[in-house]
């Protein structure tokens, strides 16, 4: 599954710039998620690495297997987002994406997504949507990112633990939705759409072939 992580992108070593901060976050990640399987290293100055952690998404109390990966950024939270004072939201965040295969395409997309708040002087929070002009990854017709928060216990604990310079760090899960689903959220509100996800047993792992629920 990790064959598309090509050297020098695939590396278990933490490079020198900002290594202390990145290493501290990685230690928290690995405490909850286990040892990482790979890292897509960011050679840039505003460093945002993407770690891949293997996971069986079937709960321990259930039978079967649903193997995939947790992709998690490391470095987005180094910069505060431009959160309006009246919003009362966290000013720092890291992004998480549940995927079947930890491909370089998806990991690079996730890293780019983590740069958007600083580049565009904006912010991401629970329920925010980011429409794109075209599907951001191959194999899907969906063009809009939707940010939610984790419902899986280890991922929630990461969010409860992370902090930078006294600021709590929010973990936002990445989802892709259809144009019609996007319009439903704008028309009926986020809660109505979340109810629709529950009714359709929305899969934890990103499925590019998922059909629109609207």
Where are these regions (language model features)?
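Acidic, proline/glycine-rich low-complexity IDRs
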Residues: 1-214
């Amino acid at each position: 599954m990790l064959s598309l992580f090509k050297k020098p992108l695939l590396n278990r070593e933490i490079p020198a710039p900002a290594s202390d901060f990145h290493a501290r976050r990685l230690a928290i990640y690995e405490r909850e998620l286990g040892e990482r399987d790979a890292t897509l290293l960011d050679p840039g100055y505003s460093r945002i690495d993407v770690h891949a952690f293997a996971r069986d998404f079937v709960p321990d109390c259930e039978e079967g297997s649903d193997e995939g990966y947790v992709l998690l950024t490391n470095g987005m939270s180094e910069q505060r987002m431009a959160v309006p004072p009246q919003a009362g939201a966290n000013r720092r965040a890291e992004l998480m994406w549940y995927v079947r295969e930890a491909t370089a395409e998806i990991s690079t997309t996730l890293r780019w997504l983590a740069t958007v708040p600083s580049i565009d002087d904006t912010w991401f929070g629970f329920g925010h949507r980011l429409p794109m002009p075209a599907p951001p990854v191959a194999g899907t017709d969906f063009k809009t990112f939707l940010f939610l928060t984790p419902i899986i216990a280890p991922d929630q604990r990461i969010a409860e633990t992370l902090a930078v310079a006294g600021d709590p760090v929010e973990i936002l899960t990445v989802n892709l939705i259809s144009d019609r689903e996007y319009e439903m959220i704008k028309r009926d509100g986020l809660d109505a759409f979340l109810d629709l996800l529950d009714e359709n047993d929305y899969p934890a792992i990103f499925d590019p072939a998922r059909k629109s629920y609207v």
